[in-house]
Amino acid sequence: EASDGYNLENGQNRYSRGQWATALQYHDGKFYLLFTTLDEGGYLLTTTDIEGEWEKKKLNDGFYDCGLLFDNDKIYVVYGINQLRIAELDADFNKIPGNDKDVVKWSFREGLEGSRLYKIGEYYYIYSTYGGWPAFQTVFRSKDIYGPYEEKKLIDDDNIHQGALVETQTGEWWTMLFYDKGAYGRFPNLQPVKWVDGWPEIGENGKGVTTYRK
C-alpha cells in the first residue's frame, strides 16, 4: 500500500520489505502478477495491457516466493521455503480446502525457495533455487501435480541462480537468472536451455556461459 516507506518520504523506507520473488503469468488475454510482502501479505494484480492500468486485489493468503500455473481449468501455486507446497486456487485466488499440500523438501541443504511451476509435455516442473551463499539452481519433476517429485541440480556456478524458464516464439528455451556478486549487486543473467531425457540443462555442462553465439 502507498506509504511514506514505499514513497521514500519523511526518512522512511521499505528496503527488503517489498515484493518477494513476484510471479508473472499471461493467460487467456490477461496478465497476472502474484506476490507477497512480509508485512501486508499476498496481492494479485491483473491487466489486459501490461503498460496500462493494473487492478489490485488483497488476497486472504500470502504465498512466499511463489510460482503460478494455469493448467486447463485449474489454477495452482507453488510456494514456501525449505518445505515447498502446492495449492489449488479458486477463481478468486483463495486456497481450495484440502488441496494445499506439501510436495518437496530441501535435500542438498536448507534455503530452497524462489520457485516457479510449469507443465511442459507430460511433466510438472518446480524450478527452484537454493538461495544464500553460495547459491545454485535446481529442478523437480513429476507426472502428478502433487508428486512424488524427483530432483536434479542444474547449475552450481559462482552464484548464478533464481529465475524462470522461457520458451520463445520459435521454440527455443532460455532461462533468466541473476548473477549474485555480493556488494556489487545482482546482475541479470540469460542462459541457454536444452532438454535432455525430459530434464532442462542450463549453460554448458552445468556451468553458466558468459557469451553465447546462436
Where in the sequence are the language-model features?
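Carbohydrate-active catalytic/glycan-binding domains of CAZyme proteins
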Residues: 1-214
